[in-house]
């Protein structure tokens, strides 16, 4: 499964949900007629989105399976995913792009070749995306995923090169 969004809460009284999409285009999730929801990434529940509207950076979604606010409230925090087989196939070298889930576990080095850590996750801040890096000592560091910092993503060698010092 590839996670493409997160339910942030209910909307209205008819079972609609508010969703933060992790897709390049805000309405990219709506390209998929079937979604899988999970609160633990182990067991998945199939749902069918029937309509949506865009509200700022959020999607307001109607799901066929939910018709009241009480039931929809239980979905807060759940992840929205689709099977990888439903996503467009990308080149292995990453030149056509990559999915966030493919970056988890990749090594991060700076432009001097020094190992910084491994990608533990990514998240969106509104201003830009952020890499969550697991450092060798167990601590985490946040690195902005912007062109000025991320110099290269090499999917073949599973390495991201960043313009970042070890002591930032």
UniProtKB/Swiss-Prot annotation:
GO terms for biological process: ribosomal small subunit biogenesis; rRNA processing. Belongs to the RimM family. Gene3D superfamilies: PRC-barrel domain, RimM. Residues 95-168 form the PRC barrel domain. InterPro entries: PRC_barrel-like_sf, PRC_RimM, RimM, RimM_N, RimM_N_sf, Transl_B-barrel_sf. Binds ribosomal protein uS19. One of its GO terms (cellular component) is cytoplasm. It is found in: Cytoplasm. One of its GO terms (molecular function) is ribosome binding. Transmembrane segments: none annotated. Pfam families: PRC_RimM (PF24986), RimM (PF01782). Keywords: Chaperone, Cytoplasm, Ribosome biogenesis, rRNA processing. It comes from the Bacteria. An accessory protein needed during the final step in the assembly of 30S ribosomal subunit, possibly for assembly of the head region. Essential for efficient processing of 16S rRNA. May be needed both before and after RbfA during the maturation of 16S rRNA. It has affinity for free ribosomal 30S subunits but not for 70S ribosomes. This is Ribosome maturation factor RimM. The PRC barrel domain binds ribosomal protein uS19. HAMAP family: Ribosome_mat_RimM (MF_00014).
């Amino acid at each position: 499964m590839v996670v493409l969004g997160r339910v942030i809460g209910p909307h209205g009284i008819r079972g609609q949900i508010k969703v933060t999409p992790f897709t390049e285009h805000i309405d990219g999730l709506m390209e998929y007629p079937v979604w899988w929801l999970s609160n633990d990434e182990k067991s998945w529940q199939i749902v069918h989105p029937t309509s949506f509207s865009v509200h700022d950076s959020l999607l307001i979604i109607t799901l066929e399976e939910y018709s009241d606010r009480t039931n929809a409230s239980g979905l807060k925090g759940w992840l929205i995913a689709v099977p990888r087989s439903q996503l467009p196939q990308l080149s292995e070298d990453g030149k056509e792009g990559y999915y966030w889930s493919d970056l988890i576990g990749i090594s991060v080095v700076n432009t001097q070749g020094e190992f910084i850590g491994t990608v533990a996750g990514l998240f969106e801040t509104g201003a830009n995306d952020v890499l969550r890096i697991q450092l060798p000592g167990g601590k985490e560091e946040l690195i902005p995923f912007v062109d000025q910092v991320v110099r290269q993503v090499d999917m073949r060698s599973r390495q991201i090169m960043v313009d970042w010092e070890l002591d930032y």
